[in-house]
From Swiss-Prot:
It comes from Vanderwaltozyma polyspora (strain ATCC 22028 / DSM 70294 / BCRC 21397 / CBS 2163 / NBRC 10782 / NRRL Y-8283 / UCD 57-17) (Kluyveromyces polysporus). One of its GO terms (molecular function) is protein-macromolecule adaptor activity. It comes from the Eukaryota. This is Increased recombination centers protein 6. The keyword Aminoacyl-tRNA synthetase does not apply. GO terms for biological process: vesicle-mediated transport. The keyword rRNA-binding does not apply. Involved in gross chromosomal rearrangements (GCRs) and telomere healing. Coiled coil: none annotated.
Length: 250
């Protein structure tokens, strides 16, 4: 708990246990959570008392660091009733592993869908370490996941590339990718423990746009746009959305 008795926010991050795990931990914990090497080069499973800060708020949170040998078994454990209490207190989950496109391998999409179905109102990121999967393929996977793997709770996994082979900053939809996209997701998540503290900067500028609302509306618009098959209807919808955001940002 926090000093005032409120429940502390918690994020679970899990790494595939292989010969690259030390480098992956240092990179992800450093780039996403801004932790220095002193906090990334040890075997502690819980890093307590961290602060996540944006222009608009800051929260205190604990970071749970886990590893797994078998992703399928790890998913089954986390989905089980034995872990109900843990899932309840989490704000979100980040999995670092290699995504496979091979049909004879485990059905990762099925596992991701099952895990997403029990993560109501939590963010869920799968960070792919497979260099052979391009950003365009990742975008296609996320489009499929948004429509096929969304659970009754409206929760779906977002797959994000760990490696930026092409040195891109944005994907084909002009969205952030890589570590910056992970940070953006956390910025706009529903923190499980609540207890957001508005920053001084946000208080001083009350006319700033509500970024969370903007991101959510953009996501909804993108999904609807992808479902429209007629090209003229697509262009009309894109124009309507453009005008909507122009008015919103005035």
């Amino acid at each position: 708990m926090n000093e005032d008795g409120s429940v502390c926010n918690k994020i679970l991050i899990a790494f595939q246990d292989n010969d690259q795990i030390a480098n992956l931990k240092e990179s992800v914990l450093g780039e996403v959570f801004r932790l220095d090497k002193a906090n990334t080069n040890h075997d502690e499973n819980i890093i307590k008392g961290l602060t996540w800060s944006t222009k608009y708020y800051e929260v205190r949170y604990d970071l749970y660091v886990d590893t797994f040998d078998d992703f399928e078994e790890w998913c089954k454990d986390l989905i089980s009733s034995e872990y109900d209490d843990l899932r309840e207190v989490l704000s979100g989950i980040i999995v670092i592993d290699s995504y496979t496109m091979e049909k004879d391998k485990i059905d990762q999409n099925k596992l991701l869908g099952q895990l997403g179905s029990v993560l109501q109102d939590k963010f869920f990121v799968f960070m792919n370490t497979n260099k052979d999967i391009s950003q365009d393929v990742i975008d296609e996977l996320n489009d499929d996941n948004s429509m096929q793997l969304t659970s009754d709770s409206g929760n779906s996994v977002e797959i994000i590339n760990y490696h930026n082979v092409s040195n891109l900053k944005l994907n084909q939809y002009n969205e952030k990718i890589g570590f910056e996209r992970v940070r953006e997701i956390i910025d706009t998540c529903e923190w499980s423990g609540g207890h957001r503290v508005q920053t001084v900067e946000a208080k001083a500028d009350s006319t700033d746009v509500d970024l969370e609302s903007v991101f959510n509306r953009l996501k909804e618009a993108r999904l609807k746009y992808l479902e429209i098959e007629d090209e003229d209807e697509r262009e009309q919808f894109a124009l309507e959305i453009s005008n909507e955001f122009a008015e919103f940002l005035q």
